[in-house]
Amino acid sequence: SAAYIQEDDFETLKQTNTRLLENAVRAIEQIAPNLKSIILQTGGKGYGLEFPKEVGIADHIPLKESCPRIPEPYASKIFYYTQYDLLKQLSEGKSWTFSEVRPDGVVGFAPGTNAMNMAQGIAIYLAMYKEVHGAGATAPFPGHEHGYNSTHTDTFQDILSQMEIHAALNTDKCGNGGVFNVADGKVVTWAQVWPRLCERFDLVGGRPQSDATPMLEFVKNNKNAWVTLAKRHGLNEKLVYEQGWGHTNFMLVDFDFDRQYDLSRSREVGFTESIDTAESYFRAWERMQKAKMIPPFE
């Protein structure tokens, strides 16, 4: 299950998304009598990434599945916990079991609007930056210096789906509520990845600059540049308005602390797939280009 409904407060968010999962499971049970496995896709919220200072994230790096649930009052804000407990309850005495799979920031392509599509936001931003400043311009990383060098483990959508299939097909090793981190493989920093992403747009990726225009301000002031690009290449002119810029900004600017995952457990159950993180962006962008969502690379 990877369905998600955004709500304005934590309690409503928890109730809505837990009920969403329960309805889905009960419906599946009715039409799939031979059901064997359900995969719950969660994420870094389970480690308390929304409250890094409050829960002391720095003391738990690299993040392991064995980390205990975060303490109250923060635990009550994590709907992943109630979803997990629901599956544990519903699976008791049944012929099916379940696994929880935890990606870090997901890199991928979605054919429709996805508020959490970081790769799409970066692509639109860099395409606009090139349109405004020209090929060869230096594009400073829009976050902070500390964030530029902080460690993380992005998760390409193909790696994520492959791990979920692996868990579903290996219930003897992965079932019974087993929890598994999943990521591209190597720990990375934006200092390693950002210049390579910019290069694809004929830009020079630079370090953060304190006097640079903030990303959200740049996008707000230059939406006409996207409209020009869209008309030139037959793209969706409204995409710049539909993009979840708050999430993109959160991932690049606010997530300025080490948060890498430990992948030992997924390796121990036989999952060995990996990909270069910058390459995962390139593949996602190729899919977006085929879908006429971002301009072609020149």
Residue ranges and their predicted role:
Residues 1-23, 29:
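NAD(P)H-binding glycine-rich loop region in Rossmannoid oxidoreductase-like domains
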Residues 94-162, 166:
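NAD(P)-dependent short-chain dehydrogenase/reductase
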Residues 26, 67-110:
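Active-site Tyr-X1-5-Lys
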Residues 7, 44-57, 106-109:
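Conserved catalytic-site region of short-chain dehydrogenase/reductase
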Residues 160-249, 254, 258, 262-264, ...:
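Mid/C-terminal beta-alpha module of Rossmann-like enzyme folds, strongest
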Residues 19, 78, 154-155, 188, ...:
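Residue-level signal for the nucleotide or nucleotide-sugar donor/cofactor binding architecture
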Residues 29-37:
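A short helix->loop->beta-strand "cap" motif at the edges of active sites that frequently abuts
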